């Protein structure tokens, strides 16, 4: 299981939002490449980037910062979400060196688009499902649909989607712990590896996810906890590696 630092980009700065509210953000730095370097130096093996402006505007806004990070670390898997709604955007990011693109709102509104992109860019497409009380939210979390996250995940399992990034938006940025039950249920029933997001607060949350990792938990994205020093990326990754070694022995 991977511990994946999040770098959320708003107006070219590194920020964290509370529950997806653009008017409730904390700024942690104004140099995205330097922030990426910080997490790489702690041993991060993948980075999760989010173009927050892009998520709300429906098109890339912070692509320059994303590209700069990808070019600075060409061997590091990088996933980007926010404003990815066209094949042209996906192609541009992949050509810039990004490893995975996360389709969120567009996946909910136009599921056929996901299958088309998986065929065109095999192995590079992740679907981001943001949910409140099990129901999928779209448009930068501004709208909550009547679709259940588990049901939607099942649709994408046959399309060739690489994995699901699952965010419990009631907990994201609130330091309230991961929704373990919902994450494990999605992994078991959705048929795809799941990257947990939202609510990772301390090492105990990583330990709790490790308990259900066999259900298909690929990793855990963490933001505010690592920025505020409540979770050490290196320590958390060592714990994951040790657990894996124990299971293999």
From Swiss-Prot:
Compartment(s): Cytoplasm
GO cellular component: cytoplasm
Reaction it catalyzes: 1-(5-phospho-beta-D-ribosyl)-5-[(5-phospho-beta-D-ribosylamino)methylideneamino]imidazole-4-carboxamide = 5-[(5-phospho-1-deoxy-D-ribulos-1-ylimino)methylamino]-1-(5-phospho-beta-D-ribosyl)imidazole-4-carboxamide
Pathway: Amino-acid biosynthesis; L-histidine biosynthesis; L-histidine from 5-phospho-alpha-D-ribose 1-diphosphate: step 4/9
EC supergroup of this enzyme: isomerase
Residues that span the membrane, as ranges: none
Keywords associated with the record: Amino-acid biosynthesis, Cytoplasm, Histidine biosynthesis, Isomerase
Alphabetical list of CDD domains matching this protein: HisA (cd04732)
Gene Ontology MF term list: 1-(5-phosphoribosyl)-5-[(5-phosphoribosylamino)methylideneamino]imidazole-4-carboxamide isomerase activity
Main location (coarse class): cytoplasm
Active site positions: 8 (proton acceptor), 130 (proton donor)
UniProt EC number: 5.3.1.16
Any Pfam family: His_biosynth
NCBIfam families associated with the record: 1-(5-phosphoribosyl)-5-[(5-phosphoribosylamino)methylideneamino]imidazole-4-carboxamide isomerase, PRK13585.1
Family assignment from sequence similarity: Belongs to the HisA/HisF family.
Protein name: 1-(5-phosphoribosyl)-5-[(5-phosphoribosylamino)methylideneamino] imidazole-4-carboxamide isomerase
Organism: Chromohalobacter salexigens (strain ATCC BAA-138 / DSM 3043 / CIP 106854 / NCIMB 13768 / 1H11)
């Amino acid at each position: 299981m991977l511990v994946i630092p999040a770098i959320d980009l708003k107006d070219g700065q590194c920020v964290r939002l509370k529950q997806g509210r653009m008017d409730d953000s904390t700024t942690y730095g104004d140099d995205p490449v330097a922030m990426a370097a910080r997490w790489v130096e702690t041993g991060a093996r993948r980075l999760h980037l989010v173009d927050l402006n892009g998520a709300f505007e429906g098109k890339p806004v912070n692509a320059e910062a994303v590209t700069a990070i990808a070019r600075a670390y060409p061997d590091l898997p990088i996933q980007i979400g926010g404003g990815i709604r066209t094949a042209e955007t996906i192609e541009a990011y992949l050509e810039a060196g990004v490893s995975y693109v996360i389709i969120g709102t567009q996946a909910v509104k136009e599921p056929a688009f996901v299958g088309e992109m998986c065929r065109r860019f095999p192995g590079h497409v992740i679907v981001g499902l943001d949910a409140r009380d099990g129901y999928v939210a779209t448009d930068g979390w501004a709208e909550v649909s009547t679709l259940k996250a588990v049901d939607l995940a099942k649709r994408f399992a046959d399309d060739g989607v690489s994995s699901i990034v699952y965010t419990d938006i009631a907990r994201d940025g609130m330091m309230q712990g991961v929704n373990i039950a919902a994450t494990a249920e999605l992994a078991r029933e959705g048929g795809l590896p799941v990257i947990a997001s939202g609510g990772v607060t301390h090492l105990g949350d990583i330990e709790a996810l490790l308990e259900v990792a066999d259900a298909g938990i690929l990793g855990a994205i963490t933001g505010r906890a690592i920025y505020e020093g409540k979770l050490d990326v290196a320590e958390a990754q060592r714990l994951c590696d040790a657990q894996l070694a124990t299971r293999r022995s």
